[in-house]
Curated annotation (Swiss-Prot):
Any Pfam family hit: BTB_2
A GO MF label: potassium channel regulator activity
Motif (Selectivity filter): 381-386
Keyword Electron transport: no
Gene name of this polypeptide: Kcnb2
Cytoplasmic side: 1-190, 255-265, 318-332, 425-907
Phosphoserine carried by residues: S448, S608
SUPFAM superfamilies documented for this protein: POZ domain, Voltage-gated potassium channels
Stretches of the chain found on the membrane's Extracellular side: 213-232, 285-296, 356-368, 389-395
Activity modulation comment: Inhibited by quinine at micromolar levels. Modestly sensitive to millimolar levels of tetraethylammonium (TEA). Modestly sensitive to millimolar levels of 4-aminopyridine (4-AP).
Organism: Rattus norvegicus (Rat)
Tissue and organ distribution: Expressed in pyramidal neurons of the cerebral cortex (at protein level). In the brain, the greatest density occurs in the olfactory bulb, followed by the cerebral cortex, hippocampus, and cerebellum. In peripheral tissues it is most prominent in whole tongue epithelium and circumvallate papillae.
PTM notes: Phosphorylated. Phosphorylation at Ser-608 of the FFAT motif activates interaction with MOSPD2, VAPA and VAPB.
Name of the protein in its database record: Potassium voltage-gated channel subfamily B member 2
Length: 907
């Protein structure tokens, strides 16, 4: 069922970006609640009645009402919003206006400025046939469509001819391609242009030599007394023929398709230009006798005449001549019609003039075939005057023949001229189209233009949809896939990747822009399978012991050695942000700012998250002036046994400006007493000395650090009654133990708190954290080493800001005052024993962070929660836990009764 949009976000957003797929009953209810439906096409909203869409039930909009499941709806529309009863189609909004009017009026018209092909595609998408177009628009639509289809067909043929030049399947493809471009594409290079000019010069020279050979002054008589070619001109012709032969052979050898080369009209002309020369040489050299030569001479003359075809070789280098040839080939219908008209006129008028002039003396119209010449010359309006009619009837027939000739020739000639003009323009357009296509291909190869066809768009949309449904048999991985069952593409900006310990901090800004997820009861009720409350304490202890044992063995002195790189089979990187409170700023200790951020190991529990904090590059909120963060942890207490070593929490050093000078106080806390209660029997096993429990069911109680600190760990293992984790609303910082050489058990703090601890677990009044800045107790001061400081900005942190940098850039600030303990059901780890007075200062609850290893890639739920919403949750009133890291409060002034400023960073 669709979830409610969290506060601070746009509630009018579409369904698919914020919620799970709705149930069919919700879809049916949304359609039946209103007689109208909103259709959003390309951002333009339309409102129409359902019954209007029912007029064409077989169309896309007609099928919309019958789609009652999420999958069927997405097959019809691109997105939908049931709350607004709105369906979105990412199509052309202008064309949809005509289509929607067709539903309303039953008449389909095409807009004047609309492209015919584009409108046809829109009709196909909406499921409307083009035959419904009105007569006023149908002729224009089909004319434009046929014209565009013809142009596209010609362009496709040209591109197909270009793509057919494949040299991969032949030997020396690169060299052959260069040679082919050199001979066939004069514009490909300067050398190709020079070669084309040389070829043109040889054609002109051969034509001139052929013409000069016919001059009697330059001819020579052979041994038989017959005129023959001049020897010098014969040598010139031989050189030209040699050039033509070499050019033809090189074209043939470099051509990608030999059969296509032979069929080419230009190549046929080249062959006819050189073939007569070799045939003439063969015939003259093989027949030396006079009789044989006389018989062969006529054949040789025919081939000598064919030499004139060399002039047609210029068509290879002239676009105009090529256009003329293609025009004649494409205008064969008009040319045939012209010849038919002329033949009919010639036959009619030659017969008439013959019968009109046959009785005259010395007439030249002796027969009808003899009159064909006169009729042809007359109809073409040439009029040589060698033959003409003399009688009156003959002259009348001649006049009618002239008029008929003008009409017959004038009709088909303009069609041929138009074809030539159109073909010439098309040639220019195709040249530009080829250049544009080549530029687009280069841009696609370079990655500057992405193909946006339907298949690519569908593939990208399918990549975004990743619904993980775990089977019953895959119980081992069910904890990692519970929160994957959603279709929100905006949630998949967070990808799980394993990075080295030396990875750059800048990668966080691009790789992990996690979008905040919504608050839903389903997510809160999934704690039985995905919540870290069901982690076994024994497993966490064993895991942490392995980590700490590896670190202590490899680094006896962690302060002096670097932690070696150890491969992590499973790492997660989580971006954490500092929560900046818009309240008063306090002076801070002058400490060094840590600017290095590392990755977070998923196998580390929150107890081993020793971290540097820096938000100067990552947080969208400007940090307060001179606000620095530094973490330092207490070292081992000398003289303590293994069971007395625990991880003390990092403490705050505050400096608050009360007057002219800032006052700073640093406290050293030394835990000296530990009481461990195991309520779960022997199932958890004994608590290891140097292990920290990651179980959210444990609770460590802090006492007054100035006197003694009593810590209690309670393990209550009950899977059926696991407490649900209320939403925490601060973004975690990227931390990992793999990146810090100081992540030993002495440098880590785990405090797991319960709101209502079991009876008997309350601490003494002295166990509360003191607000007075005193030195350590006298009994402990000689044995407690100097603690490392963890100074924060000294300001009150009674509010937190949830930052969502992934999608909405909305900032939600929740101010929550902390009421008295008796009325506050919020988690608190410090409790007084029954009947004893409480410390007048407020205690700051600290809670455990869920272990990253138990969560999947989108497990971090940034849940928006209004003020007091936790109190209203009846299912969690009795037993609530909150997972976050915190720094306990330390009041710098004994007289201050205000709340201790804390800095919370929740995971």
């Amino acid at each position: 069922m669709a979830e409610k949009a969290p506060p601070g976000l746009n509630r009018k957003t579409s369904r698919s970006t914020l919620s799970l797929p709705p149930e069919p009953v919700d879809i049916i209810r949304s359609k039946t609640c209103s007689r109208r439906v909103k259709i959003n096409v390309g951002g333009l909203n339309h409102e129409v009645l359902w019954r209007t869409l029912d007029r064409l039930p077989r169309t896309r909009l007609g099928k919309l009402r019958d789609c009652n499941t999420h999958e069927s709806l997405l097959e019809v529309c691109d997105d939908y919003n049931l709350n607004e009863n709105e369906y979105f189609f990412d199509r052309h909004p202008g064309a949809f206006t005509s289509i929607l009017n067709f539903y309303r009026t039953g008449k389909l018209h095409m807009m004047e400025e609309m492209c015919a092909l584009s409108f046809g595609q829109e009709l196909d998408y909406w499921g409307i046939d083009e035959i419904y177009l009105e007569s006023c628009c149908q002729a224009r639509y089909h004319q434009k469509k046929e014209q565009m289809n013809e142009e596209l067909r010609r362009e496709a043929e040209t591109m197909r001819d270009g793509e057919g030049e494949e040299f991969d399947n032949t030997c020396c493809p690169e060299k052959r391609k260069k040679l082919w471009d050199l001979l066939e594409k004069p514009n490909s290079s300067v050398a190709a242009k020079i070669l084309a000019i040389v070829s043109i010069l040889f054609i002109v020279l051969s034509t001139i030599a052929l013409s000069l050979n016919t001059l009697p002054e330059l001819q020579e008589n052979d041994e038989f007394g017959q005129p023959s070619d001049n020897r010098k001109l014969a040598h010139v012709e031989a050189v030209c023929i040699a050039w033509f032969t070499m050019e033809y052979l090189l074209r043939f050898l470099s051509s990608p398709n030999k059969w296509k080369f032979f069929k080419g009209p230009l190549n046929v002309i080249d062959l006819l230009a050189i073939l007569p020369y070799y045939v003439t040489i063969f015939l003259t050299e093989s027949n030396k006798s006079v009789l044989q030569f006389q018989n062969v001479r006529r054949v040789v003359q025919i081939f000598r005449i064919m030499r004139i075809l060399r002039i047609l070789k210029l068509a290879r280098h002239s676009t105009g001549l090529q256009s003329l040839g293609f025009t004649l080939r494409r205008s064969y219908n008009e040319l045939g019609l012209l010849i038919l008209f002329l033949a009919m006129g010639i036959m009619i008028f030659s017969s008439l003039v013959f019968f009109a002039e046959k009785d005259e003396d010395a007439t030249k119209f002796t027969s009808i075939p003899a009159s064909f010449w006169w009729a042809t010359i007359t109809m073409t309006t040439v009029g040589y005057g060698d033959i003409y009619p003399k009688t009156l009837l003959g002259k009348i027939v001649g006049g009618l023949c002239c008029i008929a000739g003008v009409l017959v020739i004038a009709l088909p000639i303009p069609i041929i001229v138009n074809n030539f003009s159109e073909f010439y323009k098309e040639q220019k357009r195709q040249e530009k189209a080829i250049k544009r296509r080549e530029a687009l291909e280069r841009a696609k190869r370079n990655g500057s233009i992405v193909s946006m066809n339907l298949k690519d768009a569908f593939a990208r949309s399918m990549e975004l949809i990743d619904v993980a449904v775990e089977k019953a048999g895959e119980s081992a991985n069910i904890k990692d896939s519970v929160d994957d069952n959603h279709l929100s593409p905006s949630r998949w900006k967070w990808a799980r990747k394993a990075l080295s310990e030396t990875s750059s901090n800048k990668s966080y800004e691009n790789k992990y822009q996690e979008v905040s997820q919504k608050d839903s009861h389903e997510q809160l009720n999934n704690t039985s399978s995905s919540s870290p409350q069901h982690l076994s304490a024994q497993k966490l202890e064993m895991l942490y012991n392995e980590i700490t044992k590896t670190q202590t063995h490899s680094h006896p002195n962690p302060d002096c050695q670097e932690q070696p790189e150890r491969p992590s089979a499973y790492e997660e990187e989580i971006e954490m942000e500092e929560v900046v409170c818009p309240q008063e700023q306090l002076a801070v200790a002058q400490t060094e700012v840590i600017v290095d951020m590392k990755s977070t190991s998923s196998i580390d529990s929150f107890t081993s998250c020793a971290t540097d904090f820096t938000e100067t590059e990552r947080s969208p909120l400007p940090p307060p002036s001179a606000s620095h963060l530094q973490m330092k942890f207490p070292t081992d207490l000398p003289g303590m046994d293994e069971h007395q070593r625990v991880r003390a929490p990092p403490f705050l050093t505050l400096s608050r400006d009360k007057g002219p000078a800032a006052r700073e106080a640093a406290l050293d806390y030394a835990p000296i007493d530990i009481t461990v209660n195991l309520d779960a029997g022997a199932s958890h096993g004994p608590l290891q000395p140097d292990s920290a429990s990651d179980s959210p069911k444990s609770s460590l109680k802090g006492s007054n650090p100035l006197k003694s600190r009593s810590l209690k760990v309670n393990f209550q293992e009950n899977r059926g009654s696991a407490p649900q984790t209320p939403p925490s609303t601060a973004r975690p910082l990227p931390v990992t133990t793999a990146d810090f050489p100081l992540t030993t058990p002495q440098h880590m703090s785990t405090i797991l708190l319960e709101e209502s601890p079991p009876p008997g677990t309350e601490t003494l009044p002295g166990a509360d954290v003191s607000a007075h800045c005193q030195g350590p107790s006298k009994g402990l001061s000689p044995r407690v080493p100097k603690q490392k400081l963890f100074p924060f900005s000294s300001r009150e942190r009674r509010s937190f800001t949830e930052i969502d940098t992934g999608e909405d850039e909305d900032f939600l600030d929740l101010q929550r005052p902390r009421p008295d303990k008796q009325a506050d059901p919020s988690p608190n780890c410090l409790a007084d024993k029954p009947g004893e007075a409480r410390d007048p200062l407020r205690e700051e609850g600290c809670v455990g962070s869920s272990s990253p290893q138990n969560t999947d890639h989108n497990c971090r739920q940034d849940i928006y929660q209004a003020v007091g919403e936790v109190k209203k949750d009846s299912s969690q009133e009795g037993y609530k836990m909150e997972n976050h890291l915190f720094a306990p409060e330390i009041h710098s002034n004994p007289g201050d009764t205000g709340y201790c400023p804390t800095r919370e960073t929740s995971m």
